[in-house]
Structure formats: structure tokens, C-alpha cells
Amino acid sequence: SDPSLAQQPVLQGGPVHQERGFVLHQTEDRAAQDFDGTLAVTDAIRVTTSQDILTAMAKGQGPRRVVVALGYAGWGPGQLEQEMAQNAWLSVPAVPRIIFDTPFEQRWQQSARLLGIDMSTLSSQAGHA
């Protein structure tokens, strides 16, 4: 078994189906291996929901760059599109360096920088000079 797997954090992906696991992984490492229940996020990033990826990881044969989460956040039909149209979300490309290498507490700031935004200059209050 792979001893580094014991150090792999498991994140809360959202409040829906918290018993379901999701593994976000980069395809570059060991790209020839296919897993059941895998969807492409980008050319370089996949999400897998099947148990075979966990078995491969435990044997040291799975992808090396992973994010593991339990649960997900869900939206009703058209809800996310409406929120995007209302600028309720900031959208950035999926950058493997940020997803897999940046410490969790810095990912939001690093992602905002892709848009030229320095999060430390934003305020949660408006209308006060």
C-alpha cells in the first residue's frame, strides 16, 4: 500500500450526498490508466467517482496528483447559469498548479489573481468612505 495515501486529506465537497466520494485528479501522471465513472473536466483534469481509483491509489498505482472530497453542492435546472449571468460567481480556468500544488488556504487568492484581483483589497462593506 502507498503510505502517502494515509496523509491525503479528504475535503467536504458540499452538503449533498456526503457519503459519496469524488477524486479530482490530473491525467498526465499514469494517463494510460482508465477508471470507471470518470468524466473529463479539462484535457488535463478528470473527476472519478468509482471505487477502482481508490483501490489503485491504495496500491500506489493511481494518479499522484489528487484532491479527494465527500459530498457535492448541487443546483436546480438553470440555477447556476442564472447565478453566473448575475455575476454571483468569479469563473477562472482550472489550473492544475492551483488545484493540486497550492495550499488550501491560498487557492482562493491564487485563483482571484488569475483575474487580476487582489482579494486583500476588497471589502465586504459598501457605501462608507
Predicted features, each with a name:
Residues 1-68, 73-129:
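A short aromatic-anchored loop/beta-hairpin motif
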